[in-house]
Amino acid sequence: MQELRFVLIVVGALAIAALLFHGLWTSKKEGKAKFGNKPLGKLDVDQEDKDTPGQERDFAPDPEDDFEIIRKDRKEPDFGMENSFDNKFSSDPLIDDVLEAKEDKEQREEQEIPAFVATKTDDEQVEPVLQEPAKAFAEKEEAAEVVEETLQPVFEAPLAAQAPEVEVAPVVVDPVVEEPKPEPEMQVIVLNVHCAGDEPFVGTQLFDSMQQNGLIYGEMNIFHRHVDLSGNGKVLFSVANMMQPGTLEHGDPAEFSTKGISFFMTLPCYGEADQNFNLMLRIAQQIADDMGGNVLDDQRNLMTPDRLASYRRQIVEFNAANA
């Protein structure tokens, strides 16, 4: 720790000595530069001051720095040229003539200036002069109006002759009435559910199965399948009594009986006809299973795959013909 302190003291002393040496060297160098840059006039004045120390000087005190000496304007010696030039110009007769002509011109201009000052008499003389063009202009306007009155009937006649009224006959356009497309002939697809033996369907069991499959009793005293299972919306297909009179009207379901029921849908129908047919076929098969009956075609023959294919082909042909 003592050695480090000693080293720091030595380094600080060396740094201070270096700064002092650099300051002395810089001040000495600047003093030489100032002496070398002094003008000759400054050196002469300093020499005279040394020769006559006791005499008073009339010029101003020395400036604070050398830059003020440099900024002062140096007076160059004229070597006696000013007096010679003045004498030459003063004795030249050409210059005297030019100066005299210039003075005469200035005097003439001063004399001519009052001619431009307007007086009351001048205004009185100018007014009649201005009134004459106004009268002439008014006379010209009156003459122009007279010419217009004389020319006006000349131009009216040709214009009336050149602009005959052209009557445009209204164009009658017969409205194009599009012929309404003929409504397609309605077709009916029929499926039947018939009892398997001689025992008929009892109303209690039959109506319960129909209601469970989304059929609702409604108009014409038959059951319908609507778009909405709550009984709202369009009817997709309907179910009627296979026997006369064709209705499923009943007071007490237990007292109602029938040999079979008929499912039917019309073409065209609401929605997709092929989907409606598939739904009707599925419900008919479900009720036949519940009641132990059979699914028959429109001719009351057992349903076969070929007969189902013919039903679907009928739907496709109907849609193609009425597309």
From Swiss-Prot:
Annotated Gene Ontology cellular component terms: cell division site; plasma membrane
Indicate the principal place this protein occupies in or around the cell: membrane
Which ranges make up the Periplasmic topological domains here? 1-5
TM region(s), chain numbering: 6-26
Please report the name of this protein according to its UniProt entry.
Cell division protein ZipA
Taxonomic superkingdom: Bacteria
Q: Where is this region: Disordered?
A: 35-92
Record's family?
A: Belongs to the ZipA family.
Checking SUPFAM superfamilies in the record gives: Cell-division protein ZipA, C-terminal domain (SSF64383)
Cytoplasmic-side positions? 27-323
Q: Which GO terms describe its biological process?
A: division septum assembly; FtsZ-dependent cytokinesis
**Keywords tagged on the record:** Cell cycle, Cell division, Cell inner membrane, Cell membrane, Membrane, Transmembrane, Transmembrane helix
Question: Which compartment or compartments is the protein found in?
Answer: Cell inner membrane
Question: What gene makes this protein?
Answer: zipA
Per the record, where are the segments of Basic and acidic residues compositional bias?
A: 41-60, 68-78
Stated role: Essential cell division protein that stabilizes the FtsZ protofilaments by cross-linking them and that serves as a cytoplasmic membrane anchor for the Z ring. Also required for the recruitment to the septal ring of downstream cell division proteins.
